[in-house]
Amino acid sequence: MSKKRLHEIAKEIGKTSKEVVEQAQSLGLPVKSHASSVEENDATRIVESFSSSKTKAPTNSVQTNQGVKTESKTVETKQGLSDDKPSTQPVAKPKPQSRNFKAEREARAKAEAEKRQHNGDHRKNNRHNDTRSDDRRHQGQKRSNGNRNDNRQGQQNNRNKNDGRYADHKQKPQTRPQQPAGNRIDFKARAAALKAEQNAEYSRHSEQRFREEQEAKRQAAKEQELAKAAALKAQEEAQKAKEKLASKPVAKVKEIVNKVAATPSQTADSRRKKQTRSDKSRQFSNENEDGQKQTRNKKNWNNQNQVRNQRNSNWNHNKKNKKGKTNGAPKPVTERKFHELPKEFEYTEGMTVAEIAKRIKREPAEIVKKLFMMGVMATQNQSLDGDTIELLMVDYGIEAHAKVEVDEADIERFFADEDYLNPDNLTERPPVVTIMGHVDHGKTTLLDTLRNSRVATGEAGGITQHIGAYQIEEAGKKITFLDTPGHAAFTSMRARGASVTDITILIVAADDGVMPQTVEAINHSKAAGVPIIVAINKIDKPGANPERVISELAEHGVISTAWGGESEFVEISAKFGKNIQELLETVLLVAEMEELKADADVRAIGTVIEARLDKGKGAVATLLVQQGTLNVQDPIVVGNTFGRVRAMTNDLGRRVKVAGPSTPVSITGLNEAPMAGDHFAVYADEKAARAAGEERAKRALLKQRQNTQRVSLENLFDTLKAGEVKSVNVIIKADVQGSVEALAASLLKIDVEGVKVNVVHSAVGAINESDVTLAEASNAVIIGFNVRPTPQARQQADADDVEIRQHSIIYKVIEEVEEAMKGKLDPEYQEKILGEAIIRETFKVSKVGTIGGFMVINGKVTRDSSVRVIRDGVVIFDGKLASLKHYKDDVKEVGNAQEGGLMIENYNDLKEDDTIEAYIMEEIKRK
């Protein structure tokens, strides 16, 4: 069967949804709102109930309006302006009036006042009668019904009087023009009938609702009493269980307490009687004859009783303040749990008394007392030094020792700490082999033969310029090779290669013999303590003499096993691949004797082989993993920078996700390009890696400043003497960091009397506009090694007349600079003051420095000028400008009477009223 919603039924029969809902509820249907659904038969019942109620409505209206006579009234209409033709028209029944609650209250109050005046003494004697409220309620209802009928009769009489008023004053009320009666709907009559039905329904159901509410309250009170009884019973059972576990004396005391607590049930009753204040009589004042004051006093008294009862109920329900209830057994006092003192205590400098108390499970007041007895005045928030903490622990009998602070920024601790590796997880790892030797003795050719790739043909001039790391496989085992350059300029790179290597292959040409770089390679290998395998190359040449090579090496401490030494000698031809297999077998044999082990389960640590800046990838570093396993997305600290491993490629250029021990990989994701030879370590999370990297960068910067600004007695004379020496300023830019260091070291070693090389700046990457600007300011020559300038840098260099030299072979660079130094003339300079300025205000900017706001009082201040800071007539600092601004724009000069801002290189102690003197050194042309 289909269902109907109540609002649909209301729409069909022309009733409101509220009426339909109330009618359905009166019929016993389980509905809640107008959206509830009922069956068709129930819907029929609802409709029929309304039809039956319509038939009863007139009788109800008659009953509610007893004594009201309906008369047909004649109303005078103003048709035209004459009084001769009055027209009469029957008026509809009077509109039933809604209940006037205000009038009812006033009438009820007046009736009560009259009754109290008439029977005041009788009411005082019978004020304890319990049934007086019910009688008063019934009387009030009767009076309200009578008043309501009286009000309606009065309103009807008023209407009749008004009609008479119209007749007396001969005024005709305006009426609408009559319309034909026809089948017109009388909306007023219908509204009156609906209102009468609502009043009848309300009066019929009000008593029922009141009874339901009272029943619900009684049920809730009953449930609350049951819950209290159950809780009390559970509490008594728990108390009995505790009493059984307690000792006998305590049990006897508790029995007495329980007996005493169980008897005074009358105490609670007496408290209630006292709270109801039954012993005090209620006095009603009769000063006001209409009884309004008595009514107000009674009302206030009832309100006070309600507040008092509510307060009492809250008091009884408040578990924290149940002082009057003794029907339950008192809770036993919990004793403080005793904690044993620790045997050892690890402290840090500056711990507070409260922290120490928490660690040793004692009250801070107890420790403060002990310190006072020791002669130390302290509060619980006061920090203590290490000696005081140790004395305090001695008083407690605890062995105290200071906590060892671990420097998270120290990467070297991973290499020095033997506990970092787990001896049970050590496994065999591939050997790291470094090929060393003199230039053009065939190192890259040997690697080319090993890897079957033409590496040597790609090097400019046939010389290896930077370290390469490669890995090959022989007899199922991997061997990692490091190719170090053989030129003398790359001494530091060879030293780095020897520090990470396990075996050194010293390659010597059979026709050239031992050369200076060969001896240097021997010394590096011996300093690193690694075994040496000598590969005598170019034995296919006609002038080859291997015996001479063996004897020359013996003079430098490298003795063949055939002569009773420890070094293996293998005669090879790298060009034709002769005896290469024998060389690899010798490497594996020596590696097996060395017992090379690694722990692959720890976080990776290792060394940077090479680093460079790539235009598309950013900082790229070649790493050699020495311990642990390096994974993609690992947070890593490399040298003085940090980052996350974004991508890894092996020596063949293939992407890999994991790199184990002795594996060379090239990674991206670093913030800056590190230095070749820096150590790296993987941290637990990126936050720790960032903190360690920033701390290392800060320490490196501080160390650099200390080195550049430190003047000692040993170098004081050299510093003063350096002013007489001419210098050639150069800026070095190269493709990799190793080439930058090697080129700078080679240029500084050039020995020309009276002239020295000053490397103003050296970095990795292409030559940019900043390098040109620096070269212009410092009068330097830019040397690019395997890099080219950007188009913007070339245009700026042409405009500023800055010289840029590009090279791909290191020999050419050294020769060119040496010739320039030999032909260097000694120019003369004189100082020229450009202008003076006064510091008006200073601004300190974090991570930038101190900015001085100034006004030029004489001359001008240019961007490339040197400045002196003069305070009270004394020169405080002499240096170069770091920046010069006019408002927010970078400018080359600030003129007289103009304001601007400046920063001075390596100086942040500017103060107001300091004098800035700008000057330049002009070259005096020789005549």
From Swiss-Prot:
Q: Where is the composition biased (Polar residues)?
A: 49-69
Name the chain's protein: Translation initiation factor IF-2
SUPFAM superfamilies reported in the protein's UniProt record = Initiation factor IF2/eIF5b, domain 3, P-loop containing nucleoside triphosphate hydrolases, Translation proteins
List every stretch annotated G3.
483-486
G2: where is this region?
A: 462-466
Show the InterPro entries listed in the entry.
Answer: EF-G-like_DII, IF2_II, IF2_N, P-loop_NTPase, Small_GTP-bd, T_Tr_GTP-bd_dom, TF_IF2_bacterial-like, TIF_IF2
Instruction: Spell out the Basic and acidic residues composition-biased ranges.
Output: 70-86, 101-138, 160-171, 202-226, 234-257
> Record's family?
Belongs to the TRAFAC class translation factor GTPase superfamily. Classic translation factor GTPase family. IF-2 subfamily.
**Organism encoding this protein:** Streptococcus agalactiae serotype V (strain ATCC BAA-611 / 2603 V/R)
Region feature (G5): 573-575
Gene behind this protein: infB
One Pfam family for this entry, by name?
Answer: IF2_N
Q: Which residues form the tr-type G domain?
A: 428-597
- Compartmental location: Cytoplasm
Give me the residues that bind GTP, please: 437-444, 483-487, 537-540
Positions of the UniProt region annotated as G4: 537-540
Q: Where is the composition biased (Low complexity)?
A: 146-159, 300-316
* PANTHER family given in the database record: TR-TYPE G DOMAIN-CONTAINING PROTEIN, TRANSLATION INITIATION FACTOR IF-2-RELATED
* G1: annotated span: 437-444
What is this protein's function per UniProt? Answer: One of the essential components for the initiation of protein synthesis. Protects formylmethionyl-tRNA from spontaneous hydrolysis and promotes its binding to the 30S ribosomal subunits. Also involved in the hydrolysis of GTP during the formation of the 70S ribosomal complex.
One example of the protein's molecular function in GO is: translation initiation factor activity
Its taxonomic path starts at: Bacteria, Bacillati, Bacillota, Bacilli, Lactobacillales
Name the keywords, alphabetized.
Answer: Cytoplasm, GTP-binding, Initiation factor, Nucleotide-binding, Protein biosynthesis
List every stretch annotated Disordered: 27-337
Taken from the UniProt entry, a GO cellular component term is: cytosol
Supply the CDD domains for this chain.
Answer: IF2_eIF5B, IF2_mtIF2_II, mtIF2_IVc
